[in-house]
Structure formats: structure tokens, C-alpha cells
Amino acid sequence: MILRFSFFHILLLVSAAFAQTVSDTVSFVNFENREVGVYGNDEAKEDFKRNTTDKSWWYAMDKNNGENSKIVYDGEAHGNVLQLKYPKGCVGPNDNDTPACAAQIIQPLVKTADTMWSAYDIFFEEGFEFQLGGKLPGLCGGKCYTGNAMPETGDGWSARIMWRKGGNAVQLIYFMGQKSEYGDDFKWDLGGKNPQAQFTIGKWHRIVNKVSMNTVKTPGAGDKNGRVQAWLDGELVLDVDTLRLRDYDTLHVDKFYLSTFHGGSSAEWAPTHDNFIRFDNFTVSTDSIAVTLDNGGEVGLGKNLRRENRRSVSKPIEIYRVNGSRVGRGLHSESKTLPLKNGRLVKVVQ
């Protein structure tokens, strides 16, 4: 197999290498170190590094004899990416009576925190069937409750993402006090203020999540102020801040859960033919993460936008707040011009 490189890829590799030296970057995987071909457990263990003390790690990238997980070349904009297969008839993550969908990784993070960001790029290939819904990666902590296991003692939580029927995007959160035994859906519509956000087939999307743990004034009775936020292509689509994620302040954001499959568990969730999703630029950080603009530009948020990643060009394009919400185009009296590594200027305001 041949690795393809261009000047753009060299810049990506340099920026990735720099990003991994920054203390607030917990994990970064962009697959430029991999050849086109099968991407199995051995490769995943090297890329999605885990801490050495948490025994809950799980790599399941060899589903269906290695047919579900591959590295493919996606052109100069993304280079090598992870392509996951959702076989015809697959439901859920396991090899039972149907083929197992896609792949799974539970990554105990090398660093934990009470506030953590995660991000990745996602591309639903042509012909993808949303059916009734399916799971996408997200952050979790403690026992990382999923399935029909409800948190009852404040010792775990999860905040994965789902696509629903028609491509509607939601956050599936397991937390103390949830209404459904299968976790509660929080629509990506900013609490009803915005139209329901949707995934579009044949388009690269950028997903950014931020999870902030709730406070615990009394051990065993956590406060209802945990917060989960989400941005889709630079737009804030979710901001819920009434969650009881933990009952003890020893529980943190400590895992990234690359969990993706159709389901649900019954046949009506299953695709009628082989489906594919592409992923790129998996990032976990204790500081805010870049979001991708609709025009293809990139804006860095927080400390991750550093002098070493900048170069100057002629004029600004967008204005963003540090938390990721967009102010608009043009100038802003309280904004600061920040040149980015891709040769664009943005304005970022506090």
C-alpha cells in the first residue's frame, strides 16, 4: 500500500504533531499515520491510547472478520480517514443473530477532568439509511451506562450522539433521574429555539461536544447543574445545564466511547443494504476545540489557537465566541483578529 502525501498533508501532520504536544490535548487521531487498508484492534490500540490503570477498555474493530473497519483515502481535504461499514441487516454492536454494525472502542483517557471537549468529523456516504436511528461516539464517565442500564447510584453516565429518523440529530444522555431506561434524547434544536439540526448525506460535518460535571455539595446527592453542549458545523445546537451526572466528586469525564451502530435492537432499525460512514480528526481536550465553518474555514477556540499554528493573510471571515457560538460576519468592537494555520483570519470574542 502507498501512503499519499501532499503539501496540505504535511501541514496537517505538522499541526497534529504540535497539537499532541499541547498539555490540554488528551487524544488526537487523524489516521494520516495509517496506510489504506484494514484498520483493526492492533492499530486502534496504538492510536486511541488508554491509561494503564482503568481495566474497562475495549477495542472491537475486527467485527465481521475485519470487513467493518478500514482506512480509505478521501482526497486532499481530509487525506486518510476511517471508513466504518454497517452491513445489511446489522443491529447493535455485537455478533449475535445478525452481522455486527461498524466497530466499538471504549477509551479510558490518559487524563481526566471535570470539563472535557470532544470533536470529530463525520461523513454519511451516499445511500446511507438512517432508518429509526443509530449511535455515534461521545464522552462518558465511571461505569458509562448504556443499553437499558439506568444510573441509580451516581457512579456513571454517558453522553453519546444519535442520528434519528430522517437524519435528525440528538444527544442520548444517561444520568441520574432520566425518564427512559434507554437514556433520554435531547434534540439538537437549542431547547426548541432553533430548527431541528439534521445530518446531511454526502457532506462532511464537524461535531463538537463539551461536557461539564455537576457540583457535589453533599456526597451521595449531586447537584442538578451538569452541562452538555453540542455544536454542529459551528452552530450551537444543544445547551442543557440541569443534569445530575454524578453523586461524588471523584467521578470525572474519563472515557471516550467510540460507539456506533444502527439500533435499537429490533429488525426495523436495520439497514436494507451495506451502509458506510467516514470519520476523521477524533479529538479529546480539556480546552476548547476548533469547529469547522460552512465555507470550509477553520476557527480555533481557546488556548488551542496558538502562535505556532498561525500565519497572516488579508482579511477576517467570521466572528466566534470562545465557547464556539457564532456572532456573525464582519467586525466586532470586542473581537480579536486571530490568523489560523490554514491561512484564514477570524475574529474571536469573549
PLM regions with names:
Residues 291-326:
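Residue-level detector of functionally pivotal "anchor" positions at catalytic/ligand-binding pockets or at interdomain
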Residues 336-350:
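C-terminal tail/sorting-segment detector
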Residues 20-297:
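Low-complexity, Ser/Thr/Pro/Gly-rich disordered linker/stalk regions
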Residues 1-5, 350:
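Positively charged n-region of N-terminal signal peptides that target proteins for export
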Residues 328-333:
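Glycine-centered tight-turn motifs at strand-turn-strand junctions
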Residues 11-19:
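Hydrophobic h-region of N-terminal signal peptides that target proteins for export
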